[in-house]
Amino acid sequence: MAKRILVTGAATGFGRGTALALAKRGHTVIAGVQIAPQVTELMKIADEAGVPLKIQVLDITDEGDRQAAFANEVDVLINNAGVMQTGPVAEIPMENVRRNFETNVFGTLALTQGFARQMVKRGSGKIVMVTSMGGLITVPFAGVYCATKHALEALAEALKAELAGTGVEVCTANPGVYGTGFNDRGAETMMRWFDMANSLTKPEVLMAAVGGLANQLDPQSMIDAFVRIAEEDGSKFRNVVPDETAEWIRGVQAKTWEVGKDDAIWSSPPTG
């Protein structure tokens, strides 16, 4: 059965791919983009693909944009919009930290609250929090970003428990290291302020972390997972993709319980 689905952050990456894929399958898709020029760009892509999309400006940190979004009756909300600020936790400017939380946590939660009210009143709906593998483990030099995703995991767990019996499903989607350009753009954010000569970080530690972005995975398997999650009834709460990343996360989580003073926590995630 066709559903009404809102995908935030639909201008690029997973959001764009998921919005187009769902529309191709006959769903009514509202594609939220951050700024007006992205409307024209996405409209052209959708037209070329022969796919009907309702595209609207939805900067999730903007109250006016959120209120306009609430005018849509939505069966599935896919909270995909997000940004990544990177850099050593001991050195990253606090303004960057606040900016990352403003979008990934506060904007996402504000949008979710409005649609949760709509869904509970109707007695049905699904809320999907896109939290990343970084919501379950912590990546060096992406600690602030991972903190925002850990926060979304906590909010999703609480929301699921609190909305029990209302007919509203809550689940998470946790992508591994996929080549959408998002990780690369995030890695570049620290270069605007980071000074290696005066850093607390040893160069070899930084270089080892940057190497983890090599050979990223093909995004299609994650887009397929988003489509499955949106369409199915009774989704699993947590959806880590691919399976190899899920197994790696379990190993990292188990290891943290036994880590000693001189032991390393981090190991590189599975890539392509």
Label for each model-derived stretch:
Residues 132:
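Residue(s) in the substrate-gating loop at a strand-loop-helix junction
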Residues 112, 148:
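Active-site helix of classical SDR
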Residues 88-89, 96-98:
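Substrate-binding pocket helix/loop in short-chain dehydrogenase/reductase
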Residues 57-68, 94:
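The beta1-alpha1 cofactor-binding region of Rossmann-like NAD(H)/NADP(H)-dependent oxidoreductases
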Residues 165-235:
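SDR active-site lid
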Residues 25-41:
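Conserved glycine-rich Rossmann-like NAD(P)H-binding loop of the short-chain dehydrogenase/reductase
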Residues 11-13:
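Conserved glycine-rich cofactor-binding loop
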